């Protein structure tokens, strides 16, 4: 699972996901990509599940790039705990995704293979996505 080696602060505010992605919204490395259409938090487990699904389908063919990294810690309070006594402890990591963001890229495979692999990866994501190709 992906997570930062170290961070300046252990806990973060939740923040808001408004607007569209201004960075990371163009294909840079591969020829085909999976683009987010909705805002969401995507966990490191979901990113890894998508990457594995694509790798398994492509079967050593082509190359896959993961364009998102989970750098936001999400805290969870223990079950049956009274209110107060501070914020919970960091439980897992998420990546803040805005519409337009490229999640995965793929190259070195035919479009049919890339499209099918990304469809499987899209099923692992909690948001609607679209398949795009470089001009």
UniProtKB/Swiss-Prot annotation:
One matching Pfam family: Ribosomal_L16
Residue ranges of the region described as Disordered: 1-21
Quaternary data: Part of the 50S ribosomal subunit.
Gene Ontology terms, MF aspect: rRNA binding; structural constituent of ribosome
UniProt cross-references to SUPFAM superfamilies, sorted A to Z: Ribosomal protein L16p/L10e (SSF54686)
Any single biological process term in GO: mitochondrial translation
Positions with biased composition (Basic residues): 1-17
Protein name: Large ribosomal subunit protein uL16c
Compartment(s) of residence: Plastid, Chloroplast
Protein keywords: Chloroplast, Plastid, Ribonucleoprotein, Ribosomal protein
């Amino acid at each position: 699972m992906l997570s930062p080696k170290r961070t300046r602060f252990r806990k973060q505010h939740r923040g808001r996901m408004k607007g569209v992605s201004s960075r990371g919204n163009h294909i840079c490395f591969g020829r085909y990509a999976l683009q987010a259409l909705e805002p969401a938090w995507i966990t490191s487990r979901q990113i890894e599940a998508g990457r594995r699904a694509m790798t398994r389908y492509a079967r050593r063919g082509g190359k896959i790039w993961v364009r998102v990294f989970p750098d936001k810690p999400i805290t969870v309070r223990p079950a049956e705990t009274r209110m107060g006594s501070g914020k919970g402890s960091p439980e897992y990591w998420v990546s803040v995704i805005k519409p337009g963001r490229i999640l995965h890229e793929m190259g070195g495979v035919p479009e049919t293979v890339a499209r099918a692999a990304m469809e499987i990866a899209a099923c692992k994501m909690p948001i609607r996505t679209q398949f795009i190709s470089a001009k």
